[in-house]
Amino acid sequence: MGPPLPLLLLLLLPPPLPRALPAPASARGRQLPGRLGCLFEDGLCGSLETCVNDGVFGRCQKVPVMDTYRYEVPPGALLHLKVTLQKLSRTGFTWQDDYTQRVIAQELANLPKAYLWHGEASGPARSLQQNADNEKWFSLEREVALAKTLRRYLPYLELLSQTPTANAHSRIDHETRPAKGEDSSPENILTYVAHTSALTYPPATRAKYPDNLLRPFSRLQPDELSPKVDGDIDKQKLIAALGAYTAQRLPGENDPEPRYLVHGSARAPRPFSATALSQRWPPPPGDAKDSPSMDDDTLLQSLLKDLQQNSEVDRLGPLKEEKADSVAGAIQSDPAEGSQESHGRGAEGQPREQTDAPETMLQDHRLSEVDDPVYKEVNRLSFQLGDLLKDYGSPLLPEGPLLEKSSREEIKKSEQPEEVLSSEEETAGVEHVRSRTYSKDLFERKPNSEPQPRRLEDQFQNRAPELWEDEESLKLAAQGPPSGGLQLEVQPSEEQQGYILTGNNPLSPEKGKQLMDQVAHILRVPSSFFADIKVLGPAVTFKVSANIQNMTTADVIKAAADNKDQLEKATGLTILQSGIRPKGKLKLLPHQEEQEDSTKFILLTFLSIACILGVLLASSLAYCLRHNSHYKLKDKLSGLGADPSADATEAYQELCRQRMAIRPQDRSEGPHTSRINSVSSQFSDGPMPSPSARSSTSSWSEEPVQSNMDISTGHMILAYMEDHLKNKNRLEKEWEALCAYQAEPNSSLVAQREENAPKNRSLAVLTYDHSRILLKSQNSHGSSDYINASPIMDHDPRNPAYIATQGPLPATVADFWQMVWESGCAVIVMLTPLSENGVRQCHHYWPDEGSNLYHVYEVNLVSEHIWCQDFLVRSFYLKNLQTNETRTVTQFHFLSWYDQGVPSSTRSLLDFRRKVNKCYRGRSCPIIVHCSDGAGRSGTYVLIDMVLNKMAKGAKEIDIAATLEHLRDQRPGMVQTKEQFEFALTAVAEEVNAILKALPQ
């Protein structure tokens, strides 16, 4: 038959996680009938109920008990009950909770029952009306169980030989039974372990325990308790159980030796772990194995002498002598030695001082029990067994972090008067522990020396934090009169989980399991020691299951940190960090948070760099395309010169097809109704807001105006360009011919007059007598009609298209504005800066701000727009003070064209020309063009504009050289250098290319 069901269930039950302090009994509501668990916790049954042993947990039933039965639990159901109890315990439920009662009742409802003829029951908690005969029976049975237990377990602890003594048998005295009111000390070690499990609390008064709780001791085989089979972990559990059992023994007033370490009330105290015991009794100096005072012979002699020197041994009855022999035989390792020492003298023992009196309800029974010598000797030997466990338990304990304690509970002493606590006070959450501590050193004391008492209060100053360290493992449950006791305020703690952070992200579950297995190997614990193992990114998290070593998560973390190199070598992982965090804060570990932040930063950095590179690449591409457009035209023109029969013919045919497919209608221009227009009308085809004064804006490339150029004009332009590109010397020949050309007539007598000579800027450029602008002398401030300005006719000899004039001199500014007013001019084209290299090219003939008066003409600056670095636009109001008329005049000032030179690019000048023509569109007045002398730069601009205007109007033929001769017939010196003439040809070619691109496809 296997171990009893309560033992297996409760040994495997982990300690509960305290959710909160226990509520008073009144707060739990009315007690339900038939509650379960009364064998392990008192106070469950009502005043009219008794606890019936059902073979599992115990059930409360009303008196008289009519229906008694036991559950027959198969192995599968046993495992299921274990899992259920573990879940309830970890959640924090106790037997007092209705939820626990419902869950356990539901689990037991499916189990088979075996009905009994007589029920085994015990009264409610702390009831003094127990059956005295039943209590005496189990008192003797307890002594027999203790003898058998010592005989079995002392060899297992390697303290004595495994050979049992021949006379280690005891009989049961059915006639001698203790009185009722006996204390609740457990009969044997396994019963004690079962009753001090996490979910249960032992009852204040003993119930009649079932026989099967004692049967395992007589049925266990020697090999079942062999250290080779069970290993170090079973030794540690047994050591803790034995130590706690010896601490549970309660003395009477006249006991020769105190037999308990923690004097509790009816509730049994929390069992000390092996670690706590090793800390409670300090080990003697030197190695335990080498010390001569710790050999087995000396221990046995001391134990046997104490037993035989009892003064009342000779007066024992026959049955009690057998009981004493049974105890002596249970602790002897050698039969011969035991018989030799059984008649030696005993040591004198004096009772230690007692600070608290026994409970009133137990006084009668204890006084009667003191008279029993066997009871005295058994309890005294139990105390000596505690000292043996102190010295021999330490070598069996695991090394390393097991002795390290991370969490502490504050311990407070209570000086309240002694009184019996009510049920509400028992469940109040502050546990009162009345305790007296005694320690006897068997190995260092001298014979006939009086043992020195050691108070529990003194020991708790240094040892209490270690003894009560783990609040999650076992909870102290003893309550009694508070006089001289201790108050332990058990504070609920948030569930903690340990984590080990590695350099692998993500960490595979297999690697995480391997890492925890290696940690378990270092701690010498099984893999099941760790629960809830999870992998979160690069970290593995875990919880420490309930264990007899009282090992906490902090101990495991310290062990992992101390053995970091060993773990890395065994698993191949890089351990970055280990620690403890609340369960809810494990989602983002420090390394994960840092890694996520760095990842975001790196990602944003790369995106920014990519955007910057994209913008730079697009800008470079656009620049290259625009820069190469000029060279594409030159390449095309060069290709036309190299092979005129191919590209030229194809371009001409394409132009013909386009013009035949789409022939735009001639646009009719509305009549010019007024010479006075607003500034806004000059810069756009439609109304637009007038620009603010002296503002600047960027320029835009004006698209060429839609041309009326037909197929014949296209043929003429292509043929002319083809001829110039094919014949390299044609340009030079044409320029030589132009230089030799003499205009007829070319008389300049008026300009050469003495009164007019100061009005000429250059003697090389004088107006022809037949082609000059005549001012109204009556309006002139000098009563003169002369000004160095020439009208340039195009196709209508009556209306000049341009007026080419020199830059005004300080003496001719009034004449210049008079010419502007009398000619009705609205557009002025200025092609020179005011000065070049310190040489004055033109006088500043307009106001910088406000207005200036020149004779009878008031000029008011309205606005000044800087369109680009090459030119700007100014707008003026011109008022005739004699007539009070006002007109608007716009000046286009080109800044980057110097004397005897050409602009840096044709593109800027062509854009400038388009801007001028856009403002001039729809007007019939001439355009005033001037530079410094009014011939070189002014002639080049007029030549380009005149040729392009003819092409746009659909001229049937075009000859640039002939056009220049036509200009020189009207003003001398037009286009002064060969470079200016070549620049005019290039500008015309580029504008033709732009017109061809603008034609509808």
Swiss-Prot record:
UniProt region (Disordered), positions on chain: 271-296, 308-359, 394-459, 663-705
A Gene Ontology biological process term: insulin secretion involved in cellular response to glucose stimulus
A Gene Ontology cellular-component term: receptor complex
Tyrosine-protein phosphatase domain span: 731-991
Polar residues biased stretches: 674-684
Organism: Mus musculus
In-chain residues carrying the UniProt-annotated modification Phosphothreonine: T697
Annotated protein name in UniProt: Receptor-type tyrosine-protein phosphatase N2
UniProt feature, compositional bias: Low complexity: 394-404, 691-705
UniProt PTM comment: Subject to proteolytic cleavage at multiple sites during maturation of secretory granules. In the brain at least IA-2beta71, IA-2beta64 and IA-2beta60 have been detected, in the pancreas and a pancreatic beta cell line only IA-2beta60 has been detected.
Function in brief: Plays a role in vesicle-mediated secretory processes. Required for normal accumulation of secretory vesicles in hippocampus, pituitary and pancreatic islets. Required for the accumulation of normal levels of insulin-containing vesicles and preventing their degradation. Plays a role in insulin secretion in response to glucose stimuli. Required for normal accumulation of the neurotransmitters norepinephrine, dopamine and serotonin in the brain.
Annotated signal sequence range: 1-27
Composition skew (Basic and acidic residues), residue ranges: 312-325, 340-355, 405-416, 429-459
Subunit and interaction comment: Self-associates. Interacts (via cytoplasmic domain) with PTPRN (via cytoplasmic domain). Interacts (precursor form) with CPE. Interacts with HAP1 isoform A. Interacts with AP2A1 or AP2A2 and AP1G1; indicative for an association with adaptor protein complex 2 (AP-2) and adaptor protein complex 1 (AP-1). Interacts with AP2M1; indicative for an association with adaptor protein complex 2 (AP-2). Interacts with MYO5A.
Family the UniProt entry places it in: Belongs to the protein-tyrosine phosphatase family.
